[in-house]
A protein has these predicted regions:
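Short loop/turn segments that flank or connect secondary-structure elements
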Residues: 1-213
Length: 213
């Protein structure tokens, strides 16, 4: 994207916990204490669930989903609700219109709005954001399947409750901020663990190996 273009940064996206932790890790490395950012995000979430009660309802359904069908249905409801919300990302600098964690941003921020080519026998289309039309070659494209597979691999965990291997669910950034500030699920421990693993496991495995820009 062009420097200063933040059209996609005024939408609500769902990301995985590992992505959120990596963005927080990057913010602390670049700007210091992240507590204020988390508090702002938590306040935004509290306001959003008041304006959009279906947002918290969809999130709760996802959290308590017991099978793939109910999870997919609730995820669809969450996506539909998020699509109606236009609000700046907590990591967007309102003065410069620049991302404060650009090198640590989630995957969706790395390909949303950029060109992509669906690989399918019955699809012959090349998509590109009209804000970024300056000429694109196939070498500029990244393999989203590889990135997605790596993200899933890094998000796997063993669930004692279900005695099965599961992966982190997708939630809005603001909801993760709420979880951190409310002290739910011992997120501070997860954050400290992620700081130790982020460079060696997360960045090297996913971003630096498969996405250079």
């Amino acid at each position: 994207c062009h420097t200063g273009c933040s059209a996609c940064c005024h939408q609500v996206f769902a990301i995985q916990l590992s992505e959120f932790l990596y963005a927080c890790y990057g913010y602390q490395r670049l700007h210091g204490n992240i507590e204020n950012i988390l508090n702002v995000g938590s306040s935004v979430y509290s306001r959003l669930v008041t304006e959009y009660p279906e947002l918290s309802q969809a999130i709760q359904k996802i959290e308590f989903a017991t099978d793939a069908a109910s999870y997919q249905k609730s995820s669809g409801q969450l996506a539909e609700c998020m699509g109606r919300i236009k609000i700046p990302c907590i990591f967007l600098n309102s003065s410069t219109n620049l991302c404060m964690v650009y090198d640590y941003r989630p995957i969706v921020c790395r390909y949303y709005g950029l060109a992509y080519l669906p690989i399918s026998d019955d699809i012959d289309k090349f998509y590109i954001c009209k804000e970024n039309v300056q000429g694109v070659t196939l070498s500029d494209l990244v393999n989203l399947d590889i990135l997605g597979d790596n993200l899933i691999e890094l998000s796997l965990f063993k669930s004692k409750k279900y005695n099965a291997v599961m992966f982190d669910m997708l939630f809005p950034i603001f909801y993760f901020c709420y979880l951190f500030t409310s002290g739910k699920d011992n997120f501070n421990f997860k954050f400290e663990k992620m700081k130790k693993l982020s460079r060696a496991k997360y960045a090297d495995s996913m971003f630096e190996r498969n996405l250079k820009k």
